[in-house]
Amino acid sequence: MKSTFLSLTKMSSDLTVKVAVENTTYVFDKLFDYLVPSAFTDLVQVGKRVLIPFGRGNKKKQGIIFELSPVSDDIPVEKLKSISSVLDDEPVLSKELLNLAEFMKEHYFCTYYDAVKTMLPAGINYKITTLYGVREGVDEEELSEEQQRIFAYLHSKRKAVKSDKILDDFGLDNTVILEDMVKSGYLYKSDEAFRKVSDAVMKMAAPTELADSDNIKLTEKQKAVLDLIKMTGGTSVKEVCYFTGVTTGVTDALYKKGLIYYYDEEVFRIEDRTKDESLAPVALSEQQQTACDNLYAEYADSKPHTSLLFGVTGSGKTSVFMKLIERVINDNKGIIVMVPEISLTPQFVSTFSKRFGEQIAVFHSALSLGERLDEYKRVKKGLAKIVIGTRSAVFAPFEKVGLIIMDEEQEYSYKSESSPRYHAREIAKFRCSYDNALLVLSSATPSVESYYYAKNGRYSLNTLTERYGDAVLPKVVVADMNVEQQNGNVTGFSETLLENLRYNLENNKQSILLLNRRGYNTFVTCRMCGEPVVCPNCSISLTYHSANRRMMCHYCGYSVPYTEECPSCHSKSLRFGGTGTQKAESEISELFPDARILRMDTDATSSKSSYEKMITAFADGKYDILVGTQMVAKGLDFPNVTLVGVLNTDYMLYADDYRSYERTFSLLTQVVGRSGRGASKGMAVIQSYTPDNLIISMAARQDYLAFYSTEIQVRKAMLYPPFADICLIGFSGEKQQLTMKAANSFLQCFVSHARSEYPAMPLRILGPSPANVVKVSNKFRYKLIIKCKNNRDFRGLLSAVMIEFGKNKEFGQVSTYADMNALTC
């Protein structure tokens, strides 16, 4: 789909618009004023995208309208440029979502348009393309030989041609020669906006007024086709041909005779979601019903509320969601259900589809661009009332939101690690506040911050202490791997785990093994010189992958075929170390050759729909053992799984991050909770070289309250969230010394502003220091940590410093960003 814009700037109305412009820098980002040509007066609306001339060269760029206002004396009209085109028939963002974009700019230190692009499906974006064509009636004899060839080429096309096509066909590196021909009057150029994905349409046929005429001679096939089209009043050409057994030649003949006309009807690229009318109503336990009633009371209050649904693994939190949704779905308010991993989406969609059918839309990155665009349009048109998806689902374009549910709310995948660096929980709070809606945060292991707020009354608290039905929490054994090695066990599996795996295989029960490291071996070192094989672009060791016999970097994607030669000393003495999911899968296959083993990690699930196929296959009993990374630990419900094994706990505990204990406790509790969810009792084995560690003991007991009471004291003593916010200022550049200098210069600038403008502001500053992985993709990374209160004064201070620092040309090659409450510090 394309949009061609015309020059209509001479006839301007008395209307101006404030426009957020794409690809601006944070330093210079603002809402820019433009005049509205009179031809566009009835077309412009807040939330529509426009094409505008921008900068000294008047380069065409996309923007989105934030405000409309009459021409005012405050802005000299003669200095304003005019918009070139209106791209959208309808606004793509509501006033609420535009307000959200302003919120995101302030809180996440991004540009307006970065926030806007985050909310829109990629398929709806336009690409601005320059085209060149020949001017008629010019004498090309004065052109150079190369210019004449270009002129003849374009003349033969009889229409303007995209610049990329011309450059490719003539082997040109740039458009200099084309621009010279434009200036000389031989060529003209125009700009067109092409959308990345077109709407899906179906060719339809409908009868004209002549269809009832008896004076036109028809064949039997033509008569049968015309009768069917008249009977339906309009139907797809494909269906007409199918039911009458003809080809499109017959319909084309009717079209030429003037008896039918063709038109396109929009269709949606979505999978079938059929409601199961035979399903029994959702049955809740007494605890579940109490929680559901409490949540509904908050929903019905028509004020913004946040509630924490805290329930042990297997307590039936999903059933509470569905019952609550059944009670509110007919209130004409949007419902958003978020899950942290794509791997959880298929089970959720399957479960919810059986209850709610085509009222569901799905938002996540595994969908094609066309599918994502169509789901977005279904929601915007009011055809779907429930959106299920990952982090991006929080931006679903409902006119009014009534309920947002965040399952496994503690998961870090809800936090974006690229600009805008938002947390879906904060976006959900904004939307619920704007629409007086209810936000439900659900988890068996809530984030420390969320449970703290629930205990202190900022959130309401609903608790489920028992597993649903007859299921009980699994028995947990902590295996001491030191003792295993002393006893001569050289495998990565304790005797207790092997014994229970053997029992499950003999009794047709399923098992899950968690190892949160993909690849075969996690590092490769040289026996002679002791040097590890590292990525040339990053300060990190390469991981060996047996599937393709390559050593790969999990940061930048660099890979190299495996050879036995050490790149440092050139001896053939490389040895493998560490265990990844591929190696665990291989070793289990050797120990149990008859076992059907499925590996599930990002290497194995890279293709579209692979998650769903794997989960379905395991749920159907086609595999005995599931080996995977953290994506197998959360939210999945397999009643036949009675054994869970955690192969390596220790490296998670001792990560260089204040959240490592919380992450480890949550992951262990969640994966242990996958066992024994059906009628059979479950078992879990946690393997560790530090079996007496307090976090492991509490996770084995599934004792969140004990973990919380310990962790909250540490957080308070160390001034970590929720007692302070932690803002990470990141610096990245190709020159290490320049990047270090930039970090120190930023610190001086920040301290100077803070002392002069906010002398009473409580701040603690750490660094600058190297990032945990100092070099990634040939760029050196440094960080500055600021413990603060994330309020308007602090954000204003930081924004002013970032803008001032960004104007310093000395550090133009160093990128700087701010990340509030970053995942790792």
What spans do the regions from the language model cover?
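Inter-lobe coupling/hinge segments of SF2-like helicase ATPases
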Residues: 278-285, 289, 302-730, 735-740, ...
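Short beta-strand elements
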Residues: 598, 753-771, 812-821
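Extracytoplasmic/periplasmic
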Residues: 737-752
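C-terminal structured "cap/appendage" subdomains that terminate the fold
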Residues: 761-791, 798-801
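Accessory, non-ATPase domains that flank or precede helicase/AAA+ motor cores in DNA-metabolism machines
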Residues: 1-427, 431-443, 455-471, 753, ...
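Solvent-exposed residues in well-ordered beta-strands and their adjoining turns
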Residues: 22, 37, 732-734, 787-789
